[in-house]
Every structure is written in structure tokens, then in C-alpha cells.
Amino acid sequence: MAVMNGGRATKRARRSNRISADLYDFSTFPTAEINGESTTLPPFRDGVRTFLATHARVTFPPSTLFSSLMTWQIMLRPGDSTDGSDLSSKLVSLDVVEEDVTRSSRSVYCEHCCVVGWSSHPVCRKRYRFIIRSGGDTKACTRCGNTQNLSEGSNCKWCSMALDIENWVYSQLEDNTHLLHGVIHSNGYAHLLCLNGREGGSGFLTGRAIMDFWDRLCSSLAVRKASVMDVSRKYGMDYRLLHGITRGCSWYSEWGYEFKSGSYALTKEAYQSAVDTLSAIPLSEFLFQGRKPRTQLHSIISFYQSLSCSELVTVKDLFSFLLQMIRENSSKPASKSSVLCAWSKSDVERVQQTMVKILKASGRPQANWVTRWALKRSICKSASPQLIDYCLKHFGGVLVDDGSRVVSSRCNPGSNDFEYRLESVNNVHRLSNQDVNNASVEHVKQDLRYLYETLLHPQTMAEFRSRATREKMIDAATKILDCKHFIKDYLSSTVNPVAINLWCCVELSDELKESPAPPPERLVLPLNATVSDLKIEAAKAFQEVYAMFKRFEVEELLGYGSIDDSITLKFLVGTNGVIRIKGRCSKHGLLRYRMERGVDNWKVDCKCGTKDDDGERMLACDGCGVWHHTRCIGINNADALPSKFLCFRCIELYSKKPKQSKKERGSSQVPKAGFVCRGESAAMGSGSNLSVTLRVG
């Protein structure tokens, strides 16, 4: 029986490996070769259809239940298994939701486009959402409470109650616990909405692996631009602030995402200046306190300065060293033979023997802990400070008394200093498995959080000796935190060498020239295409991409005068370039799709210089209707909104008017009917989640 069971188990393992071998590898999928386009890529509107038809399968629910959504699924394997383990629990499911905006019962506008500068784009007909869920595709019945897989039918198999599948699917689009959630409009503009690595609930996919996958996906589908709102968290802290001062940029910059414009009208130059300013603050600003008692901040900084092999001078040096210690997993012992030493072996042994004598003297009648600071002070005249620091760093684990005793060390969380004492070898057998010369990872994370709250975060920053330095640090940190939007431009230099490749710009004859034009669309035509073929292909492209262009017709090519439609296009424009066309489209019933910002004629003119929605909380003036940042008018984000608000311009105009009685003027606290803050109305209207927390790990 044992042999038979073992044999069956082996067969099942081989079968599992054979099935998973047919799946694409998550770490390499998708690639240009997989898509069959090793040199050129079609426009996104065409490439996404080919991608889904080639790699995905239509999943439940079918489009007959609700015509606005179509769901697809692609199964991937995270890597090859070499130990025969069951890979079914380690498969990655990529769900693709194709949303027809014109048939959707939800908001047709994209709030994410509005806050990154794409608010003037026409509403796209379709959105493609790429989701890797952290949980399974199960739904709980509202009547009996039992859960079942969605592929098992639209009725509960326990009580036969009809399940609201459409509502469940839409709720998934608003969930911020997904490991990955990205949306790509049919014009090729994309948003990364959600990314959660191991700290965000991922079992085996790291944040970096997920980000690599998203970047490859965008590249292979010929995405034009992709945005991300960097609100990522690491170790419970704002990672854009930590990564900004240690690397000089956002974590997403490693994949080509660049800062374009920030909230509160911040520019790229202001962002870089803030990063440079905060990174270069010298640690000496916090160490010299005159006759004041030694603080916890002073102890922590001195502690890590003594641990580092290189000199820690600035804020950047300090935080970079702590993050490096966490990454390198300080509990793992380092090989002392690989450490380059500037001193001879006899010099090191001489200093360490002196320290051993001090430990022996302090250990009578019982072994007492001696701090690193006390040891350094006791032998400061016998060797250079650099040699003493080196010997202390490698002091833990030194054998004495013919190997019967050993130097034991620990990190005291109360004093943030190392302590040493002599112990019997039998009591410290664990030293062979861990490096006691370094603080534990959890201890370093605890110190990192303390330093972050004391030195970096503007709301919790401590008082320093120099008030000017503190104000400068608060200003720089606030600017870094205000810069959340980053964009990557996927510039494609590859063109089809056996076709005509044109960027087609459109101008509507029934609109003013000042009206915003849609982004140009890329057209790929055969070499023998005529002007007539160009008009047909251009009309088809814009009709497929934008809802307002449903009845779009091309009238003429601009810049070429009156030309015959039968002229070969290659002789007119060549095989590459930009062409402008003029057309007309009946907008009857389609005006709501004119721009992603919606049909409301709202205006932003804040004193900080902001002229458009940037995703921050705003308030409209009850006098002129112009929107202003609540923070810029003195209202903190945590404070309640006033029932009535007048901007500075209206107050100035009001003060110049003849005075009225109190009864006519009315109270400034009278509520305005239907009053809603812009930040809140945008969130309610779009159903989107702009403040999603991204956790990388």
C-alpha cells in the first residue's frame, strides 16, 4: 500500500508539472515574440484584440447577462517547480475585463485622466482592466451566506437565489486589495491603479515582479502613456518620501516613470530641489545640542554611525544605510575572511584583548553588560577611533579563556546601543546561526520608523536646534509628498517597414479651433493605399476609439488642397510622418462623451497657481464658483468644511460694495443646499479610488 500510494503521488505531481508547463511564465510573459510581432507592434486598439484572442479565454459571466462587460482570463505560472510540489496553489490568474463605456450603468468619465492632465481627451469607447486578485473568484449568497465559484452558475447552488453578478464584477473594479489593477483606454493611455506586493497581501509575488509584469504588458500592447499615483507604503511609511531622499526619485522611476507636474502647481524643478535639499541636510544639525541631555535621536544616529563602515554625514546617508541593513537581512552572518581590513591582525587582537580585560573586570562577581560607549571611552587612548570601531564591530563571538567563554553581544532597545559580556560557550551556541554584531531587522525597522517620524514627515517632525533648518525640511518634505503623479511615455521607435505608418491628427469642422483636439491615432496602411483608403481607415480608427466619434466622417486632408481620392498615398506623404485631416461627426446624443472631465463647466484658479483638477481636495467659492484647494485657503484636510465660502477676490469685491444690513447680508454660516467639496464629488461621481494604497515588497 505504501508503494502504491507513493507511486500515485508521484504520478499526480508529474501531471501537475505537465499541465503548468503549458502555461506562460509570469516572469517573462508577455514578450514581443509571444505576440508574434518581434519587430513591429500594431496600435493598441488592434493589438489588444489580437492579444486576447491568442492568449485569453472568455470566462463567466457571458456578455449576454449584461452587455457592458466581457471578462477574460489568462493563467500563468510564477516559475518552474523542481521539488515536485503541487503548482495548482501557485498559479497566477490574470483577469481582463473589457468594459463598453457607452453601455455602462456607472460613470462614463475617468477621474484618473482628469488629475494627470488628460481631462480634455474625448471619452474612450472601451476600457480594458487587467487584474490579479489577491483572493478567489467566489461570491457569497446574500440569502444563505454560502459561497460558490462564479463559474458554477448565476444561481446559488444551495438556495437557487439569483446572484447579482454584474454588481460583483463592478465591485471588483473598485477594490484596492488586488495585487495588480491597471486600466488601459482604447486610445492606448493607461493608469496603474493598484499594486500590492508581499506587504500588501501577496503570498509569493513581490511588488517588483508585479511591476515588471505590468511594464512588459504595456510595452507588448503598444500602450502610449501610463500614469501612476504613487501613494505606496513600505514598512508603514510613505515610500515616495523614503525612496525620494535615498535614490533621488520615485520607486516607479526604475521603470521609466517620470514626474511631470505635481499637486499645488509644483514643477519638476521644484520637486528635484526639494529632494536635493532634504537629502543633503547634515546629521550634525541634530547631534550638537549644547549642554542639553542626550536624546533618543542622538543615540540612534550615533549608534548607526558606529555600525557603518563608511561615514554617515547626511540624512540621505543615514536612511540609505538603514534600508540597506533591512535588505541585506542583518541576521545572516557575513564572512569575516572577505572583509578588507586596514589594520594588521596583531593590532586588532591587541585592542580586543584590552576590551576582554575590561569585560572580565566588570564581570565580578557576576557577568554584567558593558555598553559599546563605555568600552570606547575606556580604551580611547590606546588606539585610533577607526580601529576601535572596527574591533567593536567584530567583537561579538570572540573566544577567550581557551575557548571556554565567548564574547556575547546584544542590542539594547532602550539605549539603542550595543552591549557586551562574557558567557559560557554552552549558553551562546546560537551564535553560530546569527550575527550578534548587528541589530535585528525588526529593531532596524523600528528605528527607521522613529527617524522617519522625527526627521522626515512634516506633521510629526521634531523640534531642532535650528528653527530655519526645521522649516526648510518641512517645506521640502511637504513638496515631495505632494508630488504623487508619475507618467511613462512608451515611445515606440519601431515601424512596419513594408507599410505606411502615419500619425493622424483630426480637426472637427463644426467646432472652434480653440476646442481641444483628441490625441492623434496611429494608422498602418499598405504601400499601395490611396487617399480614399486613408480616409476610410482614419474614420474607422476614431470611430472605434472614441464614443463621440461614432458617426465621424472624414471630409478632407489638410495642407494638400483639393486632391483626388485615387492618388496613391505614398507619393503624397511618404511612408512615415504626420497627417492632418478635417471631418465632421453628428453629436446628437453624444455630447456627454466630449471630454473625460465631464460636461460641467467648472473652473480652477487657486492662489498656488493650479488651473486644473489635480486630485487634491477643493472647495468652490459660493460667489464666483471658482474652485480652490482647501489647504491653500487655510483648511486642513482633516478639518470640516465651512457651510459657506467666499474666495479672496469675492471678499475684495464685496468690501467695495455699499454696506448692507446684517439681515440683508445674511450669516456666513448659512448652509448652502447641495454643497459638496470637489474632492468628494469627484470620488462619488466616478466610483474610482484615487487614494488607493500601493504596497511594494
Swiss-Prot record:
Mapped zinc finger ranges (PHD-type): 603-653
Signal peptide span per the entry?
A: none
Give the location in the cell. Answer: Nucleus
Name the PANTHER family on file: PHD FINGER PLANT-LIKE PROTEIN, PHD FINGER PROTEIN MALE MEIOCYTE DEATH 1-RELATED
Q: What is this protein called?
A: PHD finger protein At1g33420
| Record has Transcription as a keyword | yes
Keywords (A to Z) from UniProt = Metal-binding, Nucleus, Transcription, Transcription regulation, Zinc, Zinc-finger
Under Gene Ontology molecular function, one entry of this record is:
zinc ion binding
| Keyword Zinc-finger carried by entry | yes
Gene Ontology CC: nucleus
**Top-rank taxon, per record:** Eukaryota
Enumerate the Pfam families for this protein: PHD
